[in-house]
């Protein structure tokens, strides 16, 4: 399985109601195009031993995101990956753009020193 397939499998585990970037699950072709065209500052697969367990990324706006396979959440892997990622990257500021109903992510980022700074609203015009 290549990284795009792995990322798609992770995406399918996410809850649509708490995911800020997807309101519905894209199909495989949409996902593949997304992976190909989005050039993040950094986008890494998280490995434990020889197994892929999640991904972590940093956008051009210094927004950080992380997702760990649901079967492996709450074992400390995400926190370790986040701390290593930030240390390796060396930025002075990171943003975590989190859906306000995603309490797990709010708690996770708060535990790692992130503080709430704003609420963002959007309006879509058709």
Model-derived regions, located:
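A short beta-loop-alpha structural element at the N-terminal edge
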Residues: 1-9
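Helix-loop element at the rim of GNAT/NAT acetyltransferase active sites that forms part
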Residues: 9-24
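Acetyl-CoA-dependent GNAT
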Residues: 24-71
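Short glycine-aromatic motifs
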Residues: 40-41, 113-115
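Long, contiguous binding/interaction regions
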Residues: 56-59, 85, 97, 108
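Conserved acetyl-CoA-binding loop-helix of GNAT-fold acetyltransferases
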Residues: 74-88, 103-111
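Conserved GNAT acetyl-CoA-binding A-motif
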Residues: 89-101
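Conserved catalytic-core motifs of GNAT/GCN5-like acyltransferases
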Residues: 97-98, 115-126
């Amino acid at each position: 399985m290549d990284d795009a397939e792995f990322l798609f499998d992770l995406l399918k585990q996410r809850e649509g109601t708490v995911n800020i970037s997807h309101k519905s699950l894209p199909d495989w072709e949409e996902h593949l195009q997304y992976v190909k065209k989005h050039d993040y500052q950094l986008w890494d697969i998280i490995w434990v031993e020889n197994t892929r367990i999640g991904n972590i990324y940093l956008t051009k706006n210094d927004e950080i995101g992380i997702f760990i396979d649901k079967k492996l959440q709450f074992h400390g892997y995400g926190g370790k990956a986040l701390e290593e990622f930030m240390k390796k990257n060396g930025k002075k500021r990171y943003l975590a753009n989190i859906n306000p109903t995603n309490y797990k992510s709010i708690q996770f980022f708060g535990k790692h020193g992130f503080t709430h700074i704003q609420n963002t609203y959007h309006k879509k015009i058709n």
